[in-house]
Regions:
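Hydrophobic alpha-helical membrane context
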Residues: 14-15, 99, 397, 401
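Cleavable N-terminal export/targeting peptides
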Residues: 1-43
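Intrinsically disordered, low-complexity regions of eukaryotic proteins
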Residues: 24, 39, 46-49, 65, ...
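Soluble non-cytosolic domains of exported or imported proteins
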Residues: 27-30, 80, 202-203, 308
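Outer membrane beta-barrel
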Residues: 47-72, 77-236, 314, 319-339, ...
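Outer-membrane beta-barrel pore domains
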Residues: 22-23, 77, 240-417
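Generic recognition of long tandem-repeat/solenoid scaffolds
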Residues: 45-46, 266
Length: 417
């Protein structure tokens, strides 16, 4: 269609030129050619814009785990194993003018879930970006790091305890290049941590979340990141889920961080969560850590668990053996894998703890993880981790019996397309 249009315009220009004097004809021809160039540029720009409207992609992760001890306490701590699809996703995304969108479908063996359905409006000059739909809440640096970019196979127990990940809502965020500050604030439907998502009158239970970060780049691949976040979440008499985290091994028979072990779950009026985060990058080395607390307000103020606090932390270091450096996303305030990484090796280690104990119930898990990853290219990665966890607290015997420690070897094949 474009070629036909250009051909007709060329014929028209030639006809006009032959009907006039030579000088006038040359001038007319130049004008026509200029118009043709402008029209062609407009067509190409339109085609490029249309191409951005739909982009298809996906993520496949296959995991295999071997575990014993506390992770398999239901089977007397004997060695267990499993292989499963950790993530199987299809995505579609695009943009037109000031509006961007992305949708991710998560495939399980018997279900398909809309994991993310995000629209972003970027049309406010020198103003915030507005996003709405089913979006990721801005809670903890570790939880905000995409599974594509993680140095270890699973996130820290603290991050999995505190983050609700993707929830329906609306949020605004903005980065200020002159100061390195970034803020994010959002209001979301709270159907996480056992909350049903509505109160007794069928009104939506809401969560308000905010995160403030600061980053300073000393030179290329040398920067510091500091941040804090907080979240207030209405529970509206819903029972707080007993299990907080698995202790960094997916699909074990026992989830080791459990506030109700040896006791009971409790209905909540609301809960508060807040934390601080820090990271430092020096070329191929990245160190980061976070500390966070969950405070609960029970529906019955006379409950023994009213105003109970649950604390967690982790410290992690990773190093690219082949010299690459992680990239830092200023707009999202998080780290990504090295750009264009290929035929590269990375090692990482982490110590973490999540304490879900109270005076009479609950468990605490402390985990040590070490791992190595091989990047075939920027879309393909093989990972191997070793994990050792210790369980303690008044609910330990009820949860794991005499199996107070557990070991695991975890493996992953990752492919993006």
């Amino acid at each position: 269609m474009h070629k036909t249009t250009i051909g007709l315009l060329c014929l028209a220009a030639t006809y006009q030129a032959s009907a006039q004097t030579e000088s006038a004809g040359n001038q007319s021809l130049e004008n026509r050619l200029s118009q043709l160039e402008q029209q062609l540029a407009s067509m190409e720009a339109k085609d490029a814009s249309d191409d951005k409207w739909v982009t298809l992609g996906g993520r496949l992760q296959i995991d295999a785990n071997i575990f014993d001890g506390a992770y398999n306490a239901d089977n007397e701590g004997n060695t267990g194993s499993t292989i499963f699809p950790r993530r199987a996703r299809l995505s579609v995304e695009g943009e037109r003018s000031d509006l961007e969108y992305k949708m991710i479908l998560e495939f399980a063996e018997e279900t398909i879930e809309i994991l993310l359905l995000r629209f972003e409006y970027t049309g406010f000059e020198n103003g915030p970006t507005i996003k709405f739909g089913k979006i990721r809440e801005d809670i903890t640096l570790d939880a905000l790091t995409s599974s594509k970019h993680m140095a270890l196979i699973e996130r820290a127990s603290m991050a999995n305890t505190m983050s609700p990940y993707f929830r329906w809502g609306v949020a605004a965020y903005q980065y200020f290049p002159s100061t390195g500050l970034r803020y994010a604030v959002g209001v979301h439907k709270n159907d996480a941590f056992g909350a049903e998502g509505t109160d007794d009158d069928s009104a939506i239970s809401l969560a308000t979340t905010g995160r403030l970060t600061w980053a300073h780049e000393f030179k290329e691949n040398n920067l510091i990141h500091l941040g804090s976040w907080g979240s207030y979440r209405k529970m509206d008499n819903s029972q707080l889920s007993a299990s907080f985290a698995r202790a960094e091994v997916r699909e074990p028979n026992v989830r080791l961080v459990n506030y109700a072990a040896g006791g009971d779950t409790v209905p909540l009026d609301h809960l508060n969560q807040y934390g601080i985060e820090a990271a430092y990058q020096y070329n191929s080395l990245l160190v980061q850590g976070e500390v966070a607390r969950r405070n609960i307000a029970t529906s019955d103020p006379a409950s023994l668990l009213d105003d109970e606090n649950y604390d967690g932390y982790y410290f992690q270091a990773s190093y690219m053996l082949t010299g690459e450096s992680k990239s830092y996303s200023k707009g999202s305030a998080r780290f990504n894998q090295p750009k264009g990484v290929e035929d590269a090796w990375e090692i990482a280690a982490r110590v973490s703890s999540m304490d879900a104990t109270s005076e009479f119930q609950g468990t605490r898990a402390k985990s040590f993880t070490a791992g190595v990853s091989y990047y075939i290219d920027e879309n393909t990665k093989i990972m191997l981790n070793g994990v050792h966890s210790k369980v303690s607290g008044p609910g330990t015997e009820a949860l794991v019996g005499d199996e107070t420690s557990g070991n695991a070897i975890t493996m992953r094949f990752h492919y993006d397309f």
